[in-house]
């Protein structure tokens, strides 16, 4: 699945706010080495640099389009192509920071085990993930997938993202290698211009696998069907806008 940095940054302020909120809970005063895991176009990497300085900060991503955008944004920072499913720090890191990436990796609890091993004593694993599969925006994706002439493709193979484990599962796994684990949810309510703006938002993330699976032949028809469902699910407010409810889960683990 190819990502588009230009599509992703259309709502950069809204996407960056959770990264800012996550970083605010990292209890490190200074770092020698920090890695932004799934750095995307570098918006979260930039936050880390603003707080700690550029020395020792790097980013990694599996998508070349995102990496090119990150390198253009922060030309003095090292950005590396890597697969988070198998990546391991070559030397201990003080901060491993992951903003909205691990929801795409179903086995991320096992990956967290490995990442905790890659931290220096007192180092921090900080993670944020969307927890929104039960929201109308994502339920409508599944409804649309099984409603049109493209449905046979989705019946043969589901592209629905796997749901996240319970907060207790994260705590129980992380605390085995941590002296402190904080897990919390935040629900953001984003005012959007209209339902079409919600569609434009998810085109950069959650809707991507659905559009890819529908194929070029049905892409526009799928989008039209999905938009109609989103319009019904998100009624207009008094000023004509709609409100996108967006739950996210956060966790900060300090290695013992």
UniProtKB/Swiss-Prot annotation:
One of the protein's GO biological processes:
methylation
* Keyword line: Cytoplasm, Methyltransferase, S-adenosyl-L-methionine, Transferase
For the keyword Transferase, the answer is yes
CDD domains according to UniProt? AdoMet_MTases (cd02440)
Instruction: Give its localization.
Output: Cytoplasm
Per its UniProt record, what InterPro entries does this chain match? Answer: Methyltransf_25, SAM-dependent_MTases_sf, Trans-aconitate_MeTrfase, Trans_acon_MeTrfase_C
**Coiled coil location:** none
Known EC number = 2.1.1.144
Q: Name the Pfam families on file.
A: Methyltransf_25
Among the GO molecular function terms of this UniProt record, one is: trans-aconitate 2-methyltransferase activity
Q: Which reaction does it catalyse?
A: trans-aconitate + S-adenosyl-L-methionine = (E)-3-(methoxycarbonyl)pent-2-enedioate + S-adenosyl-L-homocysteine
Which GO CC annotations does the UniProt entry carry? cytoplasm
- Listed SUPFAM superfamilies: S-adenosyl-L-methionine-dependent methyltransferases
Family in the record:
Belongs to the methyltransferase superfamily. Tam family.
Function noted in UniProt: Catalyzes the S-adenosylmethionine monomethyl esterification of trans-aconitate.
PANTHER family, alphabetized: TRANS-ACONITATE 2-METHYLTRANSFERASE, TRANS-ACONITATE 2-METHYLTRANSFERASE-RELATED
Q: Which HAMAP family match?
A: Tran_acon_Me_trans
Q: What is this protein called?
A: Trans-aconitate 2-methyltransferase
